[in-house]
Curated annotation (Swiss-Prot):
Substrate binds at residues 247, 249. The keyword Amino-acid biosynthesis does not apply. Keywords: Cell wall biogenesis/degradation, Glycosyltransferase, Golgi apparatus, Membrane, Transferase, Transmembrane, Transmembrane helix. It comes from Oryza sativa subsp. japonica (Rice). It is found in: Golgi apparatus membrane. InterPro entries: Glyco_trans_2-like, Nucleotide-diphossugar_trans. The active site is at residues 188, 341. It is a multi-pass membrane protein. The lineage of its organism: Eukaryota, Viridiplantae, Streptophyta, Embryophyta, Tracheophyta. This is Probable glucomannan 4-beta-mannosyltransferase 7. GO terms for biological process: cell wall organization. It holds the Pfam family Glyco_trans_2_3. GO terms for molecular function: glucomannan 4-beta-mannosyltransferase activity; mannan synthase activity. Its EC number is 2.4.1.32. Belongs to the glycosyltransferase 2 family. Plant cellulose synthase-like A subfamily.
Length: 585
């Protein structure tokens, strides 16, 4: 059965595609009969004189200085021109048009998501309107104990010295009848000192009457998925109708369960209620500011659009409440990828379950405070998403409990465009092909692909992030750098290369408290090689070289300015400069 939201989503998607193509056509942008512009400009006439002249000058001799070159050098240059024009340029030209197609896919997808998101906001189509929601017994849980279901709160953690007290304390202070709430701490810590502290904290809350369970494992098999699976195997879990999950740095408000659980109670076809993330350290550096912009777009646009149209989106791994039955029917937690949360969400959706995203409910958390930590987090997510696409695509195709429109949305929009196309085209086109084009005059890149489409994506992003407008230039450069890592991660996941299933825990520093609540372990000084990111520095050298080449030999064009900025961004992040100062207040 096709839902009304799915039909509306399909209609909006068709309108977005039509609008994008119509705008491109009216601007004269889409004209495949001839290339509209060549980035780097220039023709063969300029190059045929400049390069041999330089070779001759560098080789020395009066004849070289006068512009002549030896027969040997001329022969080598002729070989280069032929190879460049006959092999390199045609190969890159194919890549250009593939990237153009991918770029159109991106802008249509972004237009669709933003249109839905803006529409939901404009008409006030709140989750409480789309789904039944009635408040429970409110402030006095004791009076309404009979209608309160049994809920378990799971907190997986691994050596979370700086934040373990915050998450455990917030979970234990949730407004819910004491006899209807179980707090389960899943501690995979390998440090005995930290493990002891976490256990003591659990005992402290237990002495206050909280039903808190401390669960450990003999090994970290399956990492977070393995810990959650272990928690679900406990006998007392069988009596719990709903499972709330929070990572160790998340601090839910006391009324979190009162606002989320009623959605599950009154809508038997709903499996998941996802809340939005809020951040306690989003103003500490330029790095955290651009991260916040990234997550704001994800929640405001992508999650909202998926929830409003197809009642499907990816579980964010934390700050959500699951129906226990849905988890079990989907096969429970699996550790086959590094995105166990997305894996469970897709499998549950294939069984016909619906999801609700509630953007008004926000849960405080911590952003990665270092560039290295953020890169490891993004690599895990990008690699895991692409790898899951490889493993579950066929299951989506043959699923019988979802509509054809929903299958299309999951395979095309959710997986193909976001997990594969987006990281590929952004890196290949803007960080490789465009810089190389300044040295290959035979290569033509349509101006609509490197000007109109990026501008359209920028406007679409800004519309839903107006408060972050002053951060936009930094965000553009930062995302340019991150595309290299995300493309490598996507390829690793798709091809299951070495390290595709490697799990790395994101380091937290407990930024939400002014004074550290526990004594920190002694800090070790990082070695120089640990503070330098060679891939980023390598790309910066490449981009700056291309920019300089463009400036010297094609000074009439202004593309070198963009390349210099990209190269500078790569260079700064290559040396781990993330703007740790009060900027853009």
């Amino acid at each position: 059965m096709v839902e009304a939201g799915e039909i509306g989503g399909a209609a909006v998607f068709a309108l977005a595609a039509a609008a994008a193509l119509s705008a491109a056509s009216s601007l004269g942008a889409v004209d495949f009969r001839r290339p509209l512009a060549a980035v780097g400009g220039g023709g063969a006439f300029e190059w045929d004189g400049v390069v041999p002249w330089l070779i001759g000058v560098l080789g020395g001799g009066d004849e070289a200085a006068a512009g002549g070159v030896s027969v040997g050098v001329a022969a080598w240059y002729e070989v280069w021109v032929r190879v460049r024009g006959g092999v390199i340029a045609p190969t890159l030209q194919v890549a250009v048009w593939v990237c153009m197609v991918m770029s159109v896919m991106l802008v249509v997808e972004a237009t669709f998501n933003s249109a839905v998101s803006l529409g939901v906001k404009a008409i006030g189509w709140r989750p409480e309107w789309r789904f039944k929601w009635e408040p429970l017994a409110g402030a006095d849980e004791e009076k309404g104990r009979g209608e309160y279901p049994m809920v378990m709160v799971q907190i997986p953690m691994y050596n979370e010295l700086e934040v373990y007290k915050l998450s455990i304390g917030a979970a234990c202070e949730l407004k819910w009848p004491k006899d209807k709430l179980i707090v389960q701490v899943l501690d995979d810590s390998t440090d005995p000192f930290i493990k002891n502290l976490v256990e003591l904290e659990c005992e402290s809350w237990a002495s206050k009457g909280v039903n808190i369970k401390y669960v450990t494992r003999s090994s970290r098999k399956g990492f977070k998925a393995g810990a959650l699976k272990k928690g679900m195997e406990c006998d007392y879990t069988k009596q719990c109708e709903y499972i709330a999950i929070f990572d160790a740095d998340f601090q839910p408000e006391p009324n979190f369960l009162l606002r989320t659980v009623p959605f599950l109670m009154h809508n038997p076809n709903v499996a998941l209620v996802q809340a939005r993330w809020a951040f306690v350290n989003d103003t500490t550096s330029l790095l955290t500011r651009v991260q916040k912009m990234f997550f704001d777009y994800h929640f405001k646009v992508e999650q909202e659009a998926g929830s409003a149209t197809f009642a499907f989106f990816s579980f964010n791994g934390t700050a959500g409440v699951w129906r226990t039955t849905a988890i079990n029917e989907a096969g429970g937690w699996k550790d086959r990828t590094t995105v166990e949360d997305m894996d469970l969400a897709v499998r549950a959706s294939l069984n016909g379950w619906k999801f609700i995203y509630v953007g008004d409910i926000r849960v405080k958390s911590e952003l990665p405070s270092t560039y290295g930590a953020y890169c490891r987090q993004q690599f895990r997510w990008a690699c895991g998403g692409a790898n899951l696409f490889r493993k579950i695509a066929m299951d989506v195709l043959v699923a019988k409990d979802i509509s054809l429109l929903k299958k299309f949305y999951m395979l095309y929009s959710f997986f193909l465009v976001r997990r594969v196309v987006a990281p590929m085209v952004a890196c290949v086109l803007y960080n490789i092909i465009v810089p190389l084009s300044v040295m290959i005059p035979e290569l033509f890149i349509p101006i609509w692909g490197v000007a109109y489409i990026p501008m359209a994506l920028l406007i679409i992003t800004t519309i839903r992030n107006p408060r972050n407008l002053h951060i936009m230039p930094f965000w553009i450069l930062f995302e340019s750098v991150m595309t290299v890592l995300r493309m490598r991660a996507a390829l690793t996941g798709l091809m299951e290369l070495s390290g595709f299933n490697k799990w790395t825990v994101t380091k937290k520093i407990g930024s939400s408290v002014e004074d550290t609540q526990v004594p920190l372990l002694p800090k070790t000084r990082k070695r120089l090689r640990d503070r330098i990111n060679l891939p980023e520095i390598g790309f910066s050298v490449f981009l700056i070289f291309c920019a300089s080449y463009n400036l010297i030999f094609h000074g009439k064009t202004s593309y070198y300015f963009n390349l210099y900025l990209q190269g500078l961004a790569f260079l700064l992040l290559g040396f781990n400069f993330t703007g740790n100062f009060a900027c853009c207040q």
